[in-house]
């Protein structure tokens, strides 16, 4: 988020978040959205894999929010994060990623940008198809999806303790 402002995805979905629902902000960064959720009376928890040194745990919550996380990690890590998100979700997950940006040097299924960071850009359909491996029901979140971002709402998380990890 820019300079202490809540993220665009949170601004778009905030009205659909119930005060009695537990919310897990997975990939919270500096915690701006998390702090806003707490300040507005929501029951929220947050974790960021970068600041927690990969120690984000499954945290069962009614709603999981993950904004601009999946597009910043390579495939193997992305799969682990998606399993954590699915395992943490009781009701629904809101997932938003970058759709466009700096296309530097090809690496894995994305790019190393001019800032030396990894980015995987997803079209709305690519994100929907990818997340369906982890949830039984995903649809494009048209209120958040725009020229820069792709977003989905997912329900019916699949059980990953039932599957072997690759």
Each language-model region and where it sits:
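Class I (Rossmann-like) S-adenosyl-L-methionine-dependent methyltransferase catalytic domain
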Residues: 1-59, 84, 92-166
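A short, conserved alpha-helix within the catalytic core of class I
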Residues: 73-84
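A conserved beta-strand element that flanks and buttresses the S-adenosyl-L-methionine
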Residues: 65
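Hydrophobic adenine-recognition pocket in adenosine-nucleotide-binding enzymes
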Residues: 69
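Short glycine-rich, flexible loops that bind phosphorylated cofactors or substrates
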Residues: 72-73, 102
């Amino acid at each position: 988020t820019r300079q202490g402002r809540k993220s665009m995805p949170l601004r778009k979905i905030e009205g659909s978040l119930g005060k009695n629902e537990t919310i897990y902000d997975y990939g919270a960064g500096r915690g701006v959205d998390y702090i806003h959720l707490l300040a507005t009376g929501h029951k929220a928890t947050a974790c960021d894999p970068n600041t927690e040194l990969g120690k984000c745990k499954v945290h069962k919550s009614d709603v999981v929010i993950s904004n601009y996380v999946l597009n910043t990690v390579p495939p193997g890590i992305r799969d682990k994060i998606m399993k954590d998100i699915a395992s943490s979700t009781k009701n629904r997950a809101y997932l938003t990623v970058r759709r466009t940006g700096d296309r530097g040097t090809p690496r894995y299924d994305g790019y190393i940008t001019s800032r030396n960071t990894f980015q995987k850009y997803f079209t709305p359909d690519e994100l929907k198809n990818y997340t369906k491996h982890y949830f039984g029901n995903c649809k494009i979140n048209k209120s958040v999806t725009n020229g820069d971002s792709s977003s989905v709402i997912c329900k019916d998380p699949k059980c990953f303790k039932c599957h072997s990890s690759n």
